[in-house]
Amino acid sequence: MNFRNLAIWLVIVAVLGGVFVVSQNSRTKSSSEISYSQLLKDVDAGKIKSAEIAGQTVLAKTADNKTLTVNAPMNSEELVNRMVAKNADVKFKSGSISFLAILVQLLPILLVVGVWLFLMRQMQGGAKGAMGFGKSKARLLTENKNRITFEDVAGVDEAKEELQEVVDFLKDPAKFQRLGGKIPKGALLVGPPGTGKTLIARAVAGEAGVPFFTISGSDFVEMFVGVGASRVRDMFEQAKKNAPCIIFIDEIDAVGRHRGAGLGGGNDEREQTLNQLLVEMDGFEANEGIILIAATNRPDVLDPALLRPGRFDRQVVVPNPDVAGREKIIRVHMKNVPLAADVDVKTLARGTPGFSGADLANLVNEAALMAARKNRRMVTMQDFEQAKDKVMMGAERRSMAMNEEEKKLTAYHEGGHAIVALNVPLADPVHKATIVPRGRALGMVMQLPEGDRYSMKYQQMTSRLAIMMGGRVAEEIIFGKENITSGASSDIKAATDLARNMVTRWGYSDILGTVAYGDNQDEVFLGHSVARTQNVSEETARLIDSEVKRLVQYGLDEARRILTDKIDDLHTLGKALLEYETLSGEEIADILKGIPPKREEEEAATAVIAPSLVPLSPGAGASVTA
């Protein structure tokens, strides 16, 4: 609320109230009001010296100079005759009403009107007018000092190329039109969260040189029926006035979800908004010169009519970057960061598989904050490594008190994961093992792939099952079955999920064959899920459970076989983890060869733990596989 406006209205109310009080007091103090019959008695008694008559109001003055006010009948001849008979001085005055009297009479009305105007102005400030709910909330971006260009976008070359063509079309349409090409009507940016979809759209705004409107998908639907469709119409009306132009809708899945997916009857405001959007994009009336760019990380929930050519002519995939893309992105975010000589961008890029652009931006920022916290003038490689740990696993919880028994359980649990990972085929190299609590995990083993991976082999999956079971088996072998902890709960869940996917999605079961089962498990529409039936019989469901159990049991048996054969290595690694708390992959290999790790006491206290892709266990230990 605007404090200045509120203060003005309070002053006005106070002034009007003061005028009313003063007028009432002046009337009270200036005269005493008596009845008409009392006035007649005073006249007959000779107490009235003079009188002034104005309409029905009589101001009579007594012999002792008191003023009496009387409301008399109109044209009261009897009163005048009696006064004349008693030699009273009688004057007649025209019945005019003073401005103050008028103001006092109008005061209640003025107060009501003032309050109404005040409320209306407040509504106008928040919603572009008292009836401004149907107005578009799209903002027109203008060039400023924070202008983003394609130079600020890295690691998504294909997406940049697609949208660069749109920008070129707006700048020089004749280049394309001479060959019969038409300007694309829309481009849909699709990709996981944090890959830079909105950043690319901002770069288009900076490069295009045409008006750029931006709005969120959630800005369309409000509490009133019909507001969403009205805002869509208003948005395109604004765009037509500024054509050629670009409209960017962020998170379009908020308004563009599949129609007919809800339960129950009644009007669906979101569907009405979507229908209006479909008509405006490619309906009876063409909107020439308006390009619509939208972003979503849920293309599977969008309505098919929204995705067809003529509305969104292009679907631009913005994936997580590969190692080369990560290197470019890191360099972009390092532009304003003073770096020490030991910082190796290529190593950082190789050590961050699966990171999105937002993750990498956060990584660089966390490293800079850590260096500033230590009063350094430059950011070192150690800061980046520690920042990776914080981004992926949370901050260290060195203050957490663990007794010796819990530490020993955790050390052997993590040692079991690491020993199995070193002895199964096609496993990713062990990068780090730690028993320092981080986040919800009391310890972790991290495996880092040697390169980006886009698919997995059957043997890699079975090896991963064995690695996941390694921690629980190690606890059983070292401490006995009766002392197994709940620390492997998330290991068991992750192994079960992997085995179920192997059976139901990837066809790794000879009994069930290469058939996809339970294809509606990820159904995002409640209405569709209720309407559809499960596509597996009870017998097939039992077979699926049986095959899942068989695969998990295979991983358990394989882990038991390896740890039984490598029991000496398990004891060696468990004791080393208790002593050093954090070990790198190279140090683990040296320890198993009988070579103690070579590091200073300071380095041991600030040992760096490399990140992992999937932390599995929040309990007494976690196995992380990449």
Curated annotation (Swiss-Prot):
GO cellular component: plasma membrane
Membrane topology summary: Multi-pass membrane protein
Segments traversing the membrane: 6-26, 99-119
Record bears the keyword Glycosyltransferase: no
Pfam family, one: AAA_lid_3
Compartment annotation: Cell inner membrane
Cofactor annotation remark: Binds 1 zinc ion per subunit.
Binding site for Zn(2+): 413, 417, 491
Residues on Cytoplasmic side: 1-5, 120-626
Active-site residues from the entry: 414
Induction: By heat shock at 40 degrees Celsius.
GO biological process, one term: cell division
EC nos: 3.4.24.-
Segments on the Periplasmic side according to the record's topology features: 27-98
Purpose: Acts as a processive, ATP-dependent zinc metallopeptidase for both cytoplasmic and membrane proteins. Plays a role in the quality control of integral membrane proteins.
HAMAP family in UniProt: FtsH
Family annotation (NCBIfam families): FtsH_fam
Protein known as: ATP-dependent zinc metalloprotease FtsH
Species this protein is from: Caulobacter vibrioides (strain NA1000 / CB15N) (Caulobacter crescentus)
Name of the gene: ftsH
